[in-house]
Amino acid sequence: MKKTDNPSTNSSANSSKVMKTKSHPFWQWFWLTFLVVSLAYAWYSFYVPSNDVVWADNMVSAQELADDSGKNMLLFFTGEWCVPCRIMKREVFADKEVMKAINSQVVPVMINIDDPYAEELVKHYKIGTTPITIFTDPQGKVLDYAVGKIGKTKFLKMLENLGATGS
């Protein structure tokens, strides 16, 4: 006599085999490593160290301070969503040499282009992308600028050139 298989019994036996199957250790380590690396990258992307640059609150107070001190202004146009801006804040503005140079030579203003109060400045300086670094005289006349992410060396060179030609 031939034994017939009952499909309902067979499928439950197969499903219990599937449930008991463990994944290969390689994949466990792969996914764990992937998760750790992803978390580290996410933290690094959003981490901006504190710095000692004394950023002006607004353009009016910055112009008054620049006028009184005889310094030029640094306008840094940024956005909350701007990854190159965060990299500049972390790698350029948090550098001790850069902080010292900024605080001694210019009046810095950080301008978030998404802020409704910055709309007039964004239009005036024709800002279409970020980051943009602009050096101006106290009246707001552009002396030098850079579009996009710049490194410490280029930033310091711009500041040096500004000192040689500026007031």
Residue spans for each PLM region:
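Conserved redox-active cysteine motifs that mediate thiol-disulfide chemistry
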Residues: F77-F93
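A short beta-strand-turn-helix
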Residues: W55-N72, I102
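N-terminal targeting signals for export/organelle localization
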Residues: M1-V53, S167
